[in-house]
């Protein structure tokens, strides 16, 4: 059927900030959807609060709203834009839940907006655990034995009362008067939400208590309408049961949880299905989880296609997944269906389905080359699968052809437990990973070992690992059994280690429940390692190629034979053992593919030499190295820069070649670059690609400055291999990181920096610290995201840092060199990567400056003033652009210093400088002559694609010409609007972790608030980050002495807005002296009832709290945790408190308006 002509404009809801469970994959799907719908001539309206996304680039949609994704704000956008249709399936759970809220609020009916892609009834049936269970029973599919706990009866009664009030207003009023009355009614309803939610939770808890007798323990708890398993978990005892139920009911927007029988240890599979309105259904790909049931699929190591199913089992699962889509009513688009299979008797049960594009869809798209999101968007507007061409085969096949795979794909998740001391590393049904890596090989062994080295955690393959608690003797087996039986990020390596220590494959399976086929594959790798250790490296091509075909990296072979990777590479080259490149083409080479989407393999054909499908061009080419798997400190912002580099280089006439291994990102989409290599970012893998590309055409150079720390680490190896690096020279990047060289440069330029020192050993660290004095900031060199960076207040704290924190940074190869010498390990590490010490500047204002330079000319693109004081990592700080409080003289001086630094470092491209300003003096904290995570935020705010401009500069253009290619030169200091960037944190995923911020970065994502008024921009940034600013209630305030004057302004604004004030003793007395009436409440350590009780009883709606000593910080940890669990906004700086107070005042006045990004720049 042809596309619909009755629709002219379509609203797409994005996913918002990057959070655990919802990452870059929705930028990838949203970007594809925007392009697909614009291609068909529709007016596309987009809402997404995440500035670091490609989809929010102003050229992608016709109207781009970088506004908070809340039902109330999206309702304003609908009222303004009047779209004909709403597509909710491209923005994850956020978009689905927002769309359903808009439906329930009557907004879609009021403005006659049709939901396309998934009907509300289908979303409800898939996401509501009760309706889903009933639907599966109707088609004869089993679900695990379960029971629901919800508050449906009392919720229905509340809703009926609300609906009656709406009906009454509609009968009495009309026109603008009716609209205003309905809006007031909705506001009243929304203000009562917290109280209603508590009633619903209490009601549902009583029902849940009965489930233990029905389902038994252990039980799996799954909240409705949440993503990434938020709020869910596995309860092994009654106290865990009630704790998880409480959290799950709170997390579920519908206050409902499913309590399910345990299927722990069963095999888990997923089917990625696409259906059109003519009922054509295709399976894009099957995915198998190596980890058995009990671990969230986002935290599992997975393979595609499924490798341990018989054809009969596969066909049964295929038919079942199609039946699920038909029954649920997913008429158009992609869905993901999850199954569990009991390995003992083959019993198949359906776990759940996602009626939308998901994380697994992104993986399936990258694994097969099939653009699920693009196809789903076109199906939503009326096309059928047979009417759409498959882009990958250049239209040789229609989209109705099921993809076929002649390779194995492995995905491994990346975790960040080191950022959250106290968090449990045990994996459950609630997702905890922050990123993932994907690798492709001709065999499972090859793709697994490629994925392991692509993780960038220091692994070179299936490296050895220490078994926790292992000691020779009687109890040794128990430690091994516990290690392989407990799901943790390192379990696969523990399994390999158990087999190295003599455990049989049967015993490993019995304890880990991992399928015997995968265990046999791991055993083959372990056995081969033993042979290599015993016999050394083979000296002939055939046997060396066989090892490489199993996925062994040069670095792994070197470590097994006590050689250096360089020696292995030299042997390999002398024997001409080189990889070939194969194409991902959706059709297993049945049709020629014009799309250059490639992976490397060392396969040996039966006859002749292995054939490479790289088909290298003779054009001028530039290679862009991506950022690898997402992690805290290196995420979507760097992928945005890499994508912009590819777009700009294509504009400038170069062939853009991308190398990356992250399946979530836009950079690994088949049409972002001219050629894509889906490969690990290691020196060996990248150099092999360079050699292939150098066979024809001219390799102009490589861009290493856009992908974060990952590609920068490869710069030296690339240079040694004669590969030109574009932009700032690696030596200058090193100068900025090398404390001694950098200090000399600052002295030469007459720029100030805090009193500092450098330590190459534990002893030297103690001496340097005593010279500088406390408090001081310590950090390792050459790290991103403030890894292991701390503020040290005392000798004791320094001792803990040196002996507990630093050992966690020691790589495996050094540990193996000094197995029993902890100090030797630390000193070896510090000899190469010394510790950097700086005097900590208390109460200083921190400033981030982004700039562009072509070696001679400098353009300062943004001066951002942090709302948090210096000492909190810049990635975790809220900041405003333009600056709010800095004088013209200070801004002029910041520009002068930045220009001097850029010229001295001969920067070619982007540069970021961090400054602290204290008592009128500007101190340089650090300089990064590369892309920073603020680049997308600055670009969106000033209306200039600075990463594109930088890429053109790096390829040889002059700065002014590169700027002119994208319009007029902006004036970042004189904008008519103000933007606020706010960070988003994953603390709710890690119970027991303190939420206090410091110099080590812990945020996963960010949002932007954009307005002509600072208070409203800040309000939008808070709403976008999920902070629900109260409009009324009680504020609790307890601040240290030096903040008492500073807090007055915020408290006065809140009192004027009708807030009551609660305060601890000293703060209450001070406020009374200033004429502010505050009620006294006990600190936690002063006896009950205290402030934590008041927060847990929901008597406090806002908290302003600062502490001045280590003891006070630890004393107030439970208070901070309580605010997090009760979702109470919590501010720890006076600037933040005042901004929040101004925002609340503006929201109360009803001033929040929405504007598309394009309108800020005419």
Swiss-Prot record:
**Residues that bind ATP 1, according to the entry?**
129, 222, 228-229, 261, 263, 268, 294-296, 338, 352
Q: Where is this region: Carboxyphosphate synthetic domain?
A: 1-456
Give positions of region: Oligomerization domain. Answer: 457-614
One cellular component term (GO) for this entry is:
cytoplasm
SUPFAM superfamilies registered for this protein in UniProt = Carbamoyl phosphate synthetase, large subunit connection domain, Glutathione synthetase ATP-binding domain-like, Methylglyoxal synthase-like, PreATP-grasp domain
**Which Enzyme Commission number(s) are listed?**
6.3.4.16, 6.3.5.5
Q: What's the stated role of this polypeptide? A: Large subunit of the glutamine-dependent carbamoyl phosphate synthetase (CPSase). CPSase catalyzes the formation of carbamoyl phosphate from the ammonia moiety of glutamine, carbonate, and phosphate donated by ATP, constituting the first step of 2 biosynthetic pathways, one leading to arginine and/or urea and the other to pyrimidine nucleotides.
Entry note about domains: The large subunit is composed of 2 ATP-grasp domains that are involved in binding the 2 ATP molecules needed for carbamoyl phosphate synthesis. The N-terminal ATP-grasp domain (referred to as the carboxyphosphate synthetic component) catalyzes the ATP-dependent phosphorylation of hydrogencarbonate to carboxyphosphate and the subsequent nucleophilic attack by ammonia to form a carbamate intermediate.
Q: What is this protein called?
A: Carbamoyl phosphate synthase large chain
Organism encoding this protein: Agrobacterium fabrum (strain C58 / ATCC 33970) (Agrobacterium tumefaciens (strain C58))
Organism ancestry? Bacteria, Pseudomonadati, Pseudomonadota, Alphaproteobacteria, Hyphomicrobiales
């Amino acid at each position: 059927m042809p596309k619909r002509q009755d629709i002219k404009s379509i609203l797409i809801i994005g996913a918002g900030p990057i959070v655990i469970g919802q990452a870059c994959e929705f930028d990838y799907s949203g970007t594809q959807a925007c392009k697909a719908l614009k291609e068909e001539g529709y007016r596309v309206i987009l809402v997404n609060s995440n500035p670091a996304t490609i989809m929010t680039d102003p050229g992608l949609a016709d109207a781009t709203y970088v506004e908070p994704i809340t039902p109330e704000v999206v309702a304003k956008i609908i009222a303004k834009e009047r779209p004909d249709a709403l597509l909710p399936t491209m923005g994850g759970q956020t978009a689905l839940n927002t769309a359903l809220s808009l439906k329930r609020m009557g907004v879609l009916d009021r403005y006659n907006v049709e939901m396309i892609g998934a009907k509300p009834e289908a979303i409800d049936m898939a996401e509501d655990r009760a309706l889903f269970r009933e639907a599966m029973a109707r088609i004869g599919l089993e679900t695990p034995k379960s029971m629901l706990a919800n508050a449906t009866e009392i919720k229905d009664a509340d809703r009926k009362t609300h609906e009656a009030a709406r009906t009454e207003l509609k009968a009495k009023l009309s026109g603008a008067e009716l609209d205003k009355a309905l809006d007031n009614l909705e506001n009243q309803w929304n203000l009562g939400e917290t109280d209603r939610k508590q009633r619903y939770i209490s009601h549902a808890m009583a029902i849940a208590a009965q489930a233990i007798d029905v389902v038994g323990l252990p039980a799996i708890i799954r909240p409705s309408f949440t993503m990434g398993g938020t709020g869910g978990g596995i309860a092994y005892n009654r106290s865990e049961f009630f704790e998880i139920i409480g959290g799950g009911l709170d997390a579920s927007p519908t206050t409902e949880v499913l309590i399910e029988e345990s299927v722990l240890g069963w095999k888990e599979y997923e089917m990625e299905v696409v259906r059109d309105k003519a009922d054509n259904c295709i399976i894009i790909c099957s995915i198998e989880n190596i980890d058995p049931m009990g671990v969230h699929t986002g935290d599992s190591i997975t393979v595609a296609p499924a490798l341990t199913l018989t054809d009969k089992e596969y066909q049964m699962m295929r038919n079942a997944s199609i039946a699920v889509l038909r029954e649920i009513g997913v008429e158009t688009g992609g869905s993901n269906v999850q199954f569990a299979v009991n390995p003992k008797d083959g019993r198949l049960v359906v776990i759940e389905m996602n009626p939308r594009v998901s994380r697994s869809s992104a993986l399936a798209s990258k694994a097969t080359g099939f653009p699920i999101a693009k196809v789903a968007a076109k199906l939503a507007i009326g096309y059928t699968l047979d009417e759409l061409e498959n882009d990958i085969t250049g239209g040789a096949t229609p989209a109705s052809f099921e993809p076929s795979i002649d390779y194995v794909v492995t995905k491994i998740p990346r975790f960040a437990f080191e950022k959250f001391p106290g968090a449990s590393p045990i994996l459950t049904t609630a997702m905890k990973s922050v990123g993932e890596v994907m690798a492709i090989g001709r065999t499972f062994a090859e793709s697994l070992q490629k994925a392991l080295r692509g993780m960038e955690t220091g692994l070179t393959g299936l490296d050895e690992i220490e078994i926790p608690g292992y000691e020779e003797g009687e109890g040794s087996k128990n430690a091994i059994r516990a290690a392989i039986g407990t799901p943790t990020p390192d379990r696969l390596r523990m399994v390999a280690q158990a087999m190295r220590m003599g455990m049989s494959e049967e015993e490993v399976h019995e304890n880990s429940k991992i399928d015997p086929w995968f265990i046999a594959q791991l055993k083959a790798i372990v056995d081969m390692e033993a042979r290599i250790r015993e016999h050394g490296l083979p000296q002939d091509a055939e046997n060396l190629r066989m090892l490489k075909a199993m996925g062994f990296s040069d670095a792994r072979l070197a470590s097994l034979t006590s050689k250096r990777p360089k020696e292995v590479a030299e042997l390999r080259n002398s024997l001409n053992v080189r990889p070939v490149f194969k194409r991902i083409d959706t059709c297993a080479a049945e049709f020629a593919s014009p799309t250059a989407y490639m992976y490397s393999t060392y396969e040996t054909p039966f006859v002749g030499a292995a054939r490479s499908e790289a088909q290298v061009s003779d054009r001028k080419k530039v290679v862009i190295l991506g950022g690898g798997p997402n992690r805290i400190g290196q995420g979507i912002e760097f992928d945005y820069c890499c994508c912009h580099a590819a777009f700009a280089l294509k504009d400038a006439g170069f062939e853009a070649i991308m190398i990356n291994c992250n399946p979530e990102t836009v950079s690994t989409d088949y049409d972002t670059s001219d050629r894509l290599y889906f490969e690990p970012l290691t020196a060996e893998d990248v150099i092999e690609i360079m050699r292939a590309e150098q066979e024809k055409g001219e390799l102009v150079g490589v861009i290493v400055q856009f992908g974060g720390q990952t590609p920068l680490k490869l710069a030296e190896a690339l240079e040694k291999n004669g590969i030109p690096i574009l932009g700032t020279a690696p030596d200058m990047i090193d100068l900025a990181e090398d404390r001694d060289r950098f200090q000399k440069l600052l002295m030469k330029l007459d720029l100030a920096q805090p009193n500092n020192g450098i330590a190459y050993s534990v002893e030297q660290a103690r001496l340097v610290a005593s010279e500088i004095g406390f408090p001081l900031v310590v950090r390792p060199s050459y790290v991103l995201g403030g890894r292991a960076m701390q503020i040290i207040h005392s000798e004791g704290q320094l001792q803990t840092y040196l002996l507990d924190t630093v050992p966690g940074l020691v790589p495996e190869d050094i540990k193996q060199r000094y197995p029993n010498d902890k100090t030797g390990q630390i000193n070896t590490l510090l000899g190469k990567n010394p510790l950097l010490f700086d005097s900590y500047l208390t109460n200083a204002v921190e400033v981030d400056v982004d700039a562009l330079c072509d070696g001679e000319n400098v353009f300062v693109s943004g001066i951002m003033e942090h709302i948090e004081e210096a000492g909190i990592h810049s990635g975790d700080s809220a900041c405003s652009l333009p600056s709010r409080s800095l004088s013209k003289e200070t801004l002029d001086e910041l520009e002068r210093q930045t220009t001097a630094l850029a010229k001295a470092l001969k920067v070619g491209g982007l540069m970021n400088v961090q400054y602290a300003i204290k008592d009128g003096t500007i101190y340089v904290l650090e300089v990064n002559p590369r892309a920073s995570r603020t680049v997308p935020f600055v670009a969106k705010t000033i209306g200039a694609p600075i990463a594109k401009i930088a890429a053109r500069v790096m390829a040889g253009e002059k700065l002014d010409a590169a700027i002119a290619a994208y319009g007029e030169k902006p004036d970042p200091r004189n904008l008519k609007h103000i933007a606020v960037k706010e960070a988003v944190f994953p603390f709710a995923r890690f119970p027991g972790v303190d939420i206090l911020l410091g110099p080590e970065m812990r945020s996963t994502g960010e949002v932007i608030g954009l307005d002509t008024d600072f208070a409203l921009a800040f309000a939008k940034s808070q709403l976008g980050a999920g902070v629900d600013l109260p409009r009324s209630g009680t504020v609790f305030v307890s601040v240290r002495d030096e903040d008492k004057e500073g807090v007055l302004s915020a408290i006065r604004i809140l009192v004027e807005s009708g807030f009551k004030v609660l305060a601890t003793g000293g703060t209450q007395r001070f406020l009374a002296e200033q004429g502010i009436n505050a009620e006294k409440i006990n600190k936690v350590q002063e006896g009950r009832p205290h402030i934590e009780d008041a927060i847990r009883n929901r008597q406090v709606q806002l908290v302003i709290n600062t502490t001045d000593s280590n003891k006070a910080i630890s004393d107030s940890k439970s208070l901070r945790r309580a605010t997090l669990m009760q979702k109470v906004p919590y501010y720890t700086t006076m600037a933040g408190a005042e901004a929040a107070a101004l925002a609340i005042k503006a929201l109360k006045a009803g001033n929040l308006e929405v504007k598309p990004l394009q309108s800020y720049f005419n």
